[in-house]
């Protein structure tokens, strides 16, 4: 049966081919030439159509798989974020907060260190002895240094005109000039802040010399108020007679004359308050030293 079918198909094909040849004898040469040209069109259309979709499959598959893969390291970046908030947050609040309240303990010795402040007022005690010792030492040194001034004032030397009872010896002008130069030289060597006290020391020396002379002569003398008893208008000195009220005025005259004579004679500046001081010598030195 198969062979019959094959033979019939071949016979039909032969008959069709012969019929076409007979219908167009000029196209016998062209038809067989046109059929092979149709055959290469098929492979060209088939081959590029199969090649072009193939790279389209590779490009989306390969990069699409690789690009989502680097998303994995993004998970790693998220992981280190966890240790950073965990590590610094725990040590910083725990460690510094504990030592700082502990360092508050050394604040206790500071109030304890106030104790050595006590010895500072203690050395003030020897300062109290200075006003007791210094005036006497200064007075003695000034009196010795200005002894020429006292001798000059006690002599009858012009232009000095002290009370006549204090004059001891009348000297010639040449001797008075020498004593005057010695007095001014010694007074110029004394610091300016002590010149007022030096002049008062001369006054004090003159008064003390007068008291010694009056004691030897058995006449009226000056004594401290603690040993005096007032009787009427005079002052009774036990066993030594009565001092008349006019004698303190006489001593005030001596004071004013000395304070006016020495600065003018030796050309020494003395503050105005120096002539108004009526306090004892120790108070004068203390007041001048504080200025």
From Swiss-Prot:
* Keyword terms, alphabetized: Repeat, Seed storage protein, Signal, Storage protein
Q: Which Pfam families is this protein grouped with? A: Gliadin (PF13016)
Record carries keyword Signal: yes
Give the signal peptide, or none.
1-19
Region (Disordered) residue spans: 38-137
Comp. bias (Pro residues): 82-99
Question: Low complexity bias located where?
Answer: 38-81, 100-117, 125-137
Cystine bridges: none
Q: Looking at the record's lineage, which domain of life comes first?
A: Eukaryota
Q: Name one GO molecular function term.
A: nutrient reservoir activity
Stored InterPro entries: Bifun_inhib/LTP/seed_sf, Bifunc_inhib/LTP/seed_store, Glia_glutenin
Q: Reproduce the miscellaneous comment text.
A: The gamma-gliadins can be divided into 3 homology classes. Sequence divergence between the classes is due to single-base substitutions and to duplications or deletions within or near direct repeats.
Query: What is the stated purpose of this protein?
Result: Gliadin is the major seed storage protein in wheat.
Q: Which family does it belong to?
A: Belongs to the gliadin/glutenin family.
Q: Which PANTHER family match?
A: GAMMA-GLIADIN, PROLAMIN PPROL 14P
Protein name listed in UniProt: Gamma-gliadin B
Give the source species.
Triticum aestivum
